[in-house]
């Protein structure tokens, strides 16, 4: 079972995440941030990852802490589920269109967290959601899962379309990278023979 479970409790939020990499795309997300719930559903549905996420946070102030802490917990649960990363493809990439928007995501389950973020979102908000929080979510996921993550916007003018295309591309790239490669026969996909949460490969 490639699963992860995290309970993150701070003075600002209380977040619980359960994640199953070998799921069927079932998602129950209740974070108090409706647009974030919608995007978490995209990760689950298109990545075929089962997600159960609940969060209670100081959203009466703004969504920043909840958004970031959900990203942290998702990243930690993903790292748990990957374990020593034996047998996975390791690399994944996808280009997702959504109407006029086109977003490319490439990632490496390297154990070396890094993000290169290239979205240009034309509005400050989508509904009540601050669009600057998109980057903060992915930074939190990458830093806590050990992903090297590159996000590029190739086209798009509608903020919702751009962000949703990004989450869909991330989901499909993650699915590609984390699926088991039968030709590896359980070997770690690194010439050094090890992939760790922090450290060079």
UniProtKB/Swiss-Prot annotation:
The lineage of its organism: Bacteria, Bacillati, Cyanobacteriota, Cyanophyceae, Synechococcales. Its EC number is 4.2.1.19. The gene is hisB. This is Imidazoleglycerol-phosphate dehydratase. It catalyses: D-erythro-1-(imidazol-4-yl)glycerol 3-phosphate = 3-(imidazol-4-yl)-2-oxopropyl phosphate + H2O. Pathway: Amino-acid biosynthesis; L-histidine biosynthesis; L-histidine from 5-phospho-alpha-D-ribose 1-diphosphate: step 6/9. One of its GO terms (biological process) is L-histidine biosynthetic process. GO terms for molecular function: imidazoleglycerol-phosphate dehydratase activity. It is found in: Cytoplasm. The keyword Manganese does not apply. Keywords: Amino-acid biosynthesis, Cytoplasm, Histidine biosynthesis, Lyase. Pfam families: IGPD. Its main location: cytoplasm. Belongs to the imidazoleglycerol-phosphate dehydratase family. GO terms for cellular component: cytoplasm. PROSITE patterns: IGP_DEHYDRATASE_1, IGP_DEHYDRATASE_2.
């Amino acid at each position: 079972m490639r699963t992860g479970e995290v309970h993150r409790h701070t003075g600002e939020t209380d977040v619980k995440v359960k994640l199953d990499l070998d799921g069927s795309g079932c998602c129950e997300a209740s974070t108090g941030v409706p647009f974030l719930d919608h995007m978490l559903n995209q990760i689950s549905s298109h990545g075929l990852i089962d997600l159960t996420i609940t969060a209670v946070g100081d959203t009466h102030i703004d969504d920043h802490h909840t958004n970031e802490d959900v990203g942290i917990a998702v990243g930690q649960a993903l790292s748990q589920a990957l374990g020593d990363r034996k047998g996975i493809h390791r690399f994944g990439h996808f280009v997702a269109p959504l109407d006029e928007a086109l977003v490319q995501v490439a990632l490496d389950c390297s154990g070396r967290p890094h993000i290169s973020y290239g979205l240009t979102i034309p509005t400050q908000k989508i509904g009540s959601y601050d669009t600057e929080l998109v980057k903060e979510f992915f930074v939190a996921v990458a830093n806590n899962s050990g992903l090297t993550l590159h996000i590029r916007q190739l086209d798009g003018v509608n903020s919702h379309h751009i962000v949703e295309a990004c989450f869909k591309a991330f989901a499909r790239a993650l699915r590609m990278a984390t699926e088991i490669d039968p030709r590896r026969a359980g070997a770690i996909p690194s010439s050094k023979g090890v992939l760790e949460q922090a450290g060079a490969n």
